[in-house]
Every structure is written in C-alpha cells, then in structure tokens.
C-alpha cells in the first residue's frame, strides 16, 4: 500500500539523518551467516548477506542464533549497510 511505502521511506530517511555517513560503523554481527535459531515459533526476519551486499528475508525461530537477524528490512539496512 502507499501508506506502507511512505512509512518505509520515512524510516530510511530517519536512519540516514540520525547516523552521519562518516561515523557509521556496521553492526558487529552483520558479517555472520544467517542462523535460524532453535525455538518453536517461526517468524520472518532479515539478515545481511555479505556476498550480495543486501538484506534478505529468512525464517527465524525466535531465539538464540546470532545477531545477524533483524525484525525489518529497514533495520537490517540501517545496521549493516555502510556507504563510502
């Protein structure tokens, strides 16, 4: 929906405004491979793919795993994409 697109655009803009490019550092776990965790409930999460240099969806089982899982693609991008 157009409301969802506007929200996404707003979040991306906020992320870019809050963290100056020159001082941004990638989240320490962005280079780790995706780890689905080991609990029973499965939800959609996003991880940073270092080979493709983008955030991708994967099924996260809700606990454990590593830090390379984010609730939204926007959060993944904010934490893991660093622009030169």
From Swiss-Prot:
SMART domains: KU (SM00131). PROSITE patterns: BPTI_KUNITZ_1 (PS00280), BPTI_KUNITZ_2 (PS50279). Its main location: secreted. Keywords: Disulfide bond, Neurotoxin, Presynaptic neurotoxin, Secreted, Signal, Toxin. SUPFAM superfamilies: BPTI-like (SSF57362). It is found in: Secreted. GO terms for cellular component: extracellular space. Disulfide bonds join 30-80, 39-63, 55-76. Expressed by the venom gland. Gene3D superfamilies: Pancreatic trypsin inhibitor Kunitz domain (4.10.410.10). Residues 1-23 form the signal peptide. One of its GO terms (molecular function) is serine-type endopeptidase inhibitor activity. InterPro entries: Kunitz_BPTI, Kunitz_BPTI_sf, Prtase_inh_Kunz-CS, TFPI/VKTCI-like. It holds the Pfam family Kunitz_BPTI. It comes from the Eukaryota. Heterodimer; disulfide-linked. The A chain has phospholipase A2 activity and the B chain shows homology with the basic protease inhibitors. PANTHER family: BPTI_KUNITZ INHIBITOR DOMAIN-CONTAINING PROTEIN, KUNITZ-TYPE PROTEASE INHIBITOR-RELATED. Belongs to the venom Kunitz-type family. This is Kunitz-type serine protease inhibitor homolog beta-bungarotoxin B4 chain.
